[in-house]
């Protein structure tokens, strides 16, 4: 048994899918499957139920996964302690980002991180919030950039910036000529939403509840770009994060309208494990990102 075997086991518990777990570990599916079997043989226990098409862990398997998470956390802590003895801003840094932030934030911050911290080797991963927090908990990620939600309170949260939500409507929509819109104007309206798993979905539902709007039950999107295209086709209206519209204008047939009373917004934060000896590293990275994003948002006004 080695650390890599435990990483395979935890990845399989996270993704509940052999191929996706193997991809996340950068190995082939047969390699991961073979190592899981070897682990079973070594321990003399059955970890998985192999009579189902789904990945189901036995009771023994679930107990081992919990213990593996603990071991991996301690190994990560040991590595961080060793890293902290050398140069603080040197070495690998594994950062996770949510899909409603990553594509729009990375073009701005990657050059900044390379310039500000040239000795950091940055690895980037995109996944939904619950997956990122699981990977952060087990030590597969060093930190994550997410929207603050109750689930992130178990970690140290470093606010990076507050991101406004704009109302996206088609250029053909009756509201397209408005320069701003009060939230109570949305009362009774149906809103296009992302599908389950996206934290932005829950936040948007909260905005709708406040405004008296409701979800359009006929459609759920897997990405902001799908929502944007549905709006451009005049198939509905939705909320869009500020970063996602910075360079859009009406290029795609969509008008973005600021909302008020109240102004919908979310806080984007960098989160990391409590007790990490690399706290100062994460704080410095968060500060560099914050300064860059705030400068960009200020210049766009």
Predicted regions mapped to residue ranges:
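Beta-alpha-beta core module
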Residues: 153-159, 163-164, 178, 225-275
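Flexible hinge/capping segments at coil-to-helix
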Residues: 152-191
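Central regulatory/effector-binding core of bacterial HTH transcription factors
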Residues: 90-153, 221-223
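Secondary-structure junction motif
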Residues: 175, 190-211, 278-287, 292-301
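Hydrophobic hinge/microswitch elements
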Residues: 128-141, 146-147, 197-257
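A short LG(V/I)-centered, amphipathic sequence patch enriched
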Residues: 40-57
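A late-sequence structural motif
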Residues: 105, 171, 255-298
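Short helix-boundary/capping micro-motifs
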Residues: 10-28, 52
